[in-house]
Design a protein with these regions (language model features):
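Active-site acidic/histidine proton-transfer and metal-coordination neighborhood
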Residues: 93-182
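N-terminal pre-domain/capping segments
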Residues: 18-105, 109, 177, 181, ...
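Residue-level detector of anion-binding/catalytic polar loops
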Residues: 55-56, 80, 113, 151, ...
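Histidine-acidic metal/acid-base catalytic patches
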Residues: 20-30, 40-47, 139, 143, ...
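Conserved beta-strand positions in the central sheet of alpha/beta enzyme cores
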Residues: 58, 83, 115-116, 153, ...
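Acidic-and-aromatic substrate-binding clefts and catalytic sites of carbohydrate-active enzymes
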Residues: 33-40, 56-69, 88-98, 122-126, ...
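Bacterial Sec-dependent N-terminal signal peptides
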Residues: 1-21
Length: 287
């Protein structure tokens, strides 16, 4: 009898684990609108995202007036600004984007994250000689942001100094601030790293990730592909994006997921509708 009870308890525990829900918040990159009539209209952007079922948006750090308009438009639709796009320049006199000193206080306790791409004019990508200066800059930025409940995430980006998710994780460990983490960006990973190692690299990164971005893409020799094949509406292309989401689910990733939309040719209402329909299909399969 005791053995039967033990078996039932173990089975129930396994069933609970297997049935773990996976419903991350889903937000849209602001580049979804950059080549359209929506480009300078944050109100129209927010209304469309609300209509389609997105949880929020990423926005670029702008002037104080631009930031205020964007934040107000998003708030009016009961959406959230998940990410703020900004730059760190290792050699610049002002290494930290000065616009953040106006914007970060406005994000106080709103659950926002500033994701930074890190540039260097004198160092090649991933050159370790930049680590020490970068760590010092990031500690300063993270400490400032922490006073307002804002997080910082390191965004690997093709053409910058920080290009790989493993480097972002290593810097996160060295910076050692509770409000600083890393980003996994699918299109940049496919452009720069080995798709065959994606599961291994993503699994190692998950404990440090504050955000993930996805999009449709093609499979194959992705390092040789241009962006029109590496960034497509979700559901387009031959790359198995659902597998990426399964890896996140299996490793208990809890953060938001963003939709990369750079240089898409379709109208925003068209490609975003396609991507949202695919997202809902993915969530149904995973839950």
């Amino acid at each position: 009898m005791k053995l039967l009870l033990i078996f039932i308890c173990v089975w129930l525990s396994l069933a609970t684990i297997n049935a773990q829900s996976f419903n991350p918040k889903f937000f849209c990159f602001s580049d979804a609108f950059s080549r359209s009539e929506y480009a300078t209209d944050p109100v129209a952007q927010a209304k469309l995202l609300k209509q389609l079922g997105f949880d929020g948006i990423e926005m670029n750090a702008g002037s104080p007036e631009q930031n205020d308009k964007k934040l107000e438009a998003v708030q009016q639709q009961n959406l959230k600004v998940f990410m703020i796009w900004a730059k760190v320049d290792l050699e610049a006199k002002e290494a930290i984007d000065a616009r953040l000193y106006d914007l970060i206080p406005k994000l106080k306790d709103k659950g926002a994250t500033v994701w930074v791409h890190i540039n260097s004019k004198s160092r090649t990508p991933s050159n370790a000689t930049g680590d020490s200066i970068c760590i010092s800059i990031l500690q300063k930025l993270a400490d400032y942001a922490d006073d307002y409940g804002v997080r910082i995430a390191l965004y690997p980006h093709h053409g910058d100094w920080l290009i790989k998710v493993g480097h972002a994780v290593a810097l996160t460990q060295k910076v050692n601030r509770r409000n600083l983490g890393a980003v996994f960006n699918l299109c940049h990973y496919l452009k720069l790293e080995d798709p065959a190692q994606l599961e291994t690299e993503l699994t190692k990164a998950v404990p440090y990730l504050f955000s993930v971005s996805i999009n449709g893409a093609d499979d194959g020799e992705t390092n040789k592909m241009e962006w029109d094949r590496l960034i497509q509406p979700l559901g387009n292309g031959s790359f198995n994006v659902l597998k990426v989401l399964k890896i996140l689910q299996q490793n208990e990733y809890k953060g938001p997921i963003g939709l990369q939309c750079y240089a898409l040719k379709e109208k925003p209402q068209d490609h975003l509708t396609t991507s949202m329909a695919t997202w809902k299909k993915y969530m149904k399969k995973l839950n």
